[in-house]
From Swiss-Prot:
Together with its co-chaperonin GroES, plays an essential role in assisting protein folding. The GroEL-GroES system forms a nano-cage that allows encapsulation of the non-native substrate proteins and provides a physical environment optimized to promote and accelerate protein folding. InterPro entries: Chaperonin_Cpn60_CS, Cpn60/GroEL, Cpn60/GroEL/TCP-1, GroEL-like_apical_dom_sf, GROEL-like_equatorial_sf, TCP-1-like_intermed_sf. CDD domains: GroEL (cd03344). This is Chaperonin GroEL 2. It comes from Salinispora tropica (strain ATCC BAA-916 / DSM 44818 / JCM 13857 / NBRC 105044 / CNB-440). SUPFAM superfamilies: GroEL apical domain-like, GroEL equatorial domain-like, GroEL-intermediate domain like. The gene is groEL2. GO terms for molecular function: ATP binding; ATP-dependent protein folding chaperone; isomerase activity; unfolded protein binding. One of its GO terms (cellular component) is cytoplasm.
Length: 543
């Protein structure tokens, strides 16, 4: 396919137009008084959102050169969202300001490579300075503040704080569409996996259609159990203790399943069999996790265990097990806390070492099950459009809260970036174009504050000057229009979010400034309509 080429200033200005188009659509959403953006959908109701990355992902420009610029800024928003889960609009505003100031200096004769080095050095220094100013987030009230600021809703903030308190910092908090007007929290305490009973004859609670086992023994094996002879020695020992038994195996079938069902129906013993979750190596790892949580030994031939030769010593325990047709929930497993902590540390290392997004996601799920369960926030609203918008806000707030717990918080409202400017006072000892690069970052850092003020109906430049002159942590509460101690007012940002926004904006701006040519596909000319012979009759059936 034929290509169109653009070079030097022409290329960079076309990229800048694309950057501005996307950034102008996104930055109106910044701050508590930010506007919404309506996104058209091919199917269903339009989406109303103020989430930067959601808006950015929808934007494709018709001009291929400008579209490259838009896609570069989209990358800033997406990467910031992936790493920190929030701060996408801040990153976009910073990138636009860095590109604008950078191109102005390139046009005046500055060397793009020198500017890039200065920008990168300044971004690193700002990141270090912000981290040094961060305050640890530990108590529930501080967590609720961070979540409230991100979601712009105190009810959502309280729910997220409650969820995090109950499932722990590594616990999974998911968001679903609710079926009522209220937004609700539901927490699964303990371990839950997506496999239910193999036979409905194991049900002990006919009304709830559940098998409920109180203080049971738990057998966990990688084997498929077909012959009852394999299980008989163990079943007899369990029966002597008059305890229920949960069997988690690759499968239970044939004679073994029939015998278990007969014993359950006759109430000779309370028993329930479920299939192990997952596949292959992941299944084995998940079974090992369950064994650690319940204090069981994983019965597997490769570990030296044969099912017909083991006793009660390989069985785990729990306070309660509830099994329905789709899920199994183990509450208060009898494993040692130290063993679980070691396993958690091992999985964390695996997450850090993995370069596969899918593997990391699955490892994170295992980590959550080991470290505290799963919380589900159900977003309630009057209409589908409102529900989707609320769901987006809750997801952003969860990500921001987890980032805050991880690295701490700094004053929000754009004030921290404006007040960290003294870190760049000596231009980092650089000179020439690198020094200019530092000054470009200095000008860009106040832009998020300016747009937060602008969107709230204030003069952005006046607000910036006032905030820069104030002590650290004092700034504009855009929701009320007053200048306050931001930490006391609960206006906080996760430092991880802000640091990533700066780093990603600097990275993309540097790449764009050092771009010397663009290569895009030449648009295809529309083919002329084919001429016909003019007869109006149809050939064949008229489908």
């Amino acid at each position: 396919m034929a290509k169109i080429l653009s070079f030097s200033d022409d290329a960079r200005h076309q990229l800048e137009h694309g950057v501005n188009a996307l950034a102008d659509a996104v930055k109106v959403t910044l701050g508590p008084r930010g506007r919404n953006v309506v996104l058209d959908k091919k199917f269903g109701a339009p989406t109303i959102t103020n989430d930067g990355v959601t808006i950015a992902k929808e934007i494709e420009l018709t001009d291929p050169h400008e579209n490259l610029g838009a896609q570069l800024v989209k990358e800033v928003a997406t990467k910031t969202n992936d790493v920190a889960g929030d701060g996408t609009t801040t990153a976009t505003v910073l990138a636009q300001a860095l590109v604008r100031e950078g191109l102005r200096n390139v046009a005046a004769g500055a060397n793009p490579t020198g500017l890039k080095r200065g920008i990168d050095a300044a971004a690193t220094k700002v990141s270090e300075a912000l981290l040094g100013k961060a305050v640890e987030v530990s108590d529930k009230a501080a967590i609720a503040h961070v979540a409230t600021v991100s979601a712009q809703d105190s009810t959502i903030g309280e729910l997220i704080a409650e969820a995090m308190e109950r499932v722990g910092r590594d616990g999974v908090i998911t968001v679903e569409e609710g079926s009522t007007l209220a937004t609700e929290l539901d927490v699964t305490e303990g371990l839950q996996f997506d496999k239910g009973f193999i036979s409905p004859n194991f049900v002990t609670d006919a009304e709830g259609q559940e098998s409920v086992l109180e203080d049971p023994y738990i057998l966990i094996t990688t084997q498929k159990i077909s012959a009852i002879e394999e299980l008989l020695p163990l079943l007899e020992k369990v029966l002597q203790d008059s305890k229920p038994l949960l069997i988690i195996a690759e499968d239970v079938e044939g004679q073994a399943l029939s015998t278990l069902v007969v014993n359950a129906l006759r109430k000779t013993m309370k028993v329930c069999a479920v299939k192990a979750p997952g596949f292959g190596d992941r299944r084995k790892a998940m079974l090992q996790d369950m064994a650690i949580l319940t204090g069981a030994e994983l019965v597997a031939p490769e570990l030296g265990y044969k099912l017909d030769q083991v006793g009660l010593e390989v069985l785990g325990t729990a306070r309660r097990v509830v099994v329905d047709k789709e899920t199994t929930t183990v509450v208060d497993g009898g494993g040692q806390a130290a063993d679980a902590a070691d396993r958690v540390a091992q999985i964390r290392k695996e997450i850090e070492a993995s370069d596969s997004e899918w593997d990391r996601e699955k490892l994170a799920e295992r980590l959550a099950k080991l470290s505290g369960g799963v919380a589900v926030i159900r977003a309630g609203a009057a209409t589908e459009v409102e529900m989707k918008e609320r769901k987006h806000r809750i997801e952003d707030a969860i990500a921001a809260t987890k980032a805050a717990v991880e690295e701490g918080t700094i004053p929000g409202g754009g004030a921290a970036l404006a007040q960290v400017l003294p870190a760049l006072d000596d231009d980092l000892g650089l000179d020439g174009d690198e020094k200019v690069g530092v000054s470009i970052v200095r000008k860009a850092l106040v832009e998020p504050l300016r747009w937060i003020a602008q969107n709230a109906g204030h003069d952005g430049y006046v607000v910036v000057q006032k905030v820069v002159d104030k002590d650290w942590g004092h700034g504009l509460d855009a929701a009320t229009g007053e200048y306050v101690d931001l930490a006391k007012a609960g206006i906080l940002d996760p430092v991880k979010v802000t640091r990533n926004a700066v780093a990603n904006a600097a990275s993309i701006a540097g790449l764009l400034l050092t771009t010397e040519s663009l290569v895009v596909d030449k648009p295809q000319e529309p083919e002329p309509a084919a001429g016909g012979h003019g007869h109006g009759h149809q050939h064949g059936p008229g489908f």
